[in-house]
């Protein structure tokens, strides 16, 4: 009788360990698959950028993200859904960013403004005065209709302050 209890207990422990290991192994495979999926970094909802400009920006954003470890995103919009551009940029960043660290650069065509949203550790690097400097550098190209150039200049300025 004691032998049967021992075998039963041994079987339960083995099944429990097998289940734990299988679950942990399956989780690892899922995480590995997610790592290979590139994250979108340019959201051109206002259709301001050409495919070539989007490709160039994505390359710059990917390199900047690797350097900083931040989520760095670009958004263009022509409708902020009744929100201020800062609220819109903040909500967008919070919804899209994988972690809280990073920057979203926004061109808002509805209000004809540019905006920067920061999150996490990026907020320590990009103070209010630095954001103003970055925005000031972005106004010249955007006033000439050079949207990609505006975003590229702002991104380079972000990296200066990193």
Predicted regions and their residues:
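A structural boundary signal for the start of the first folded domain, especially the loop/turn
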Residues: 2-162
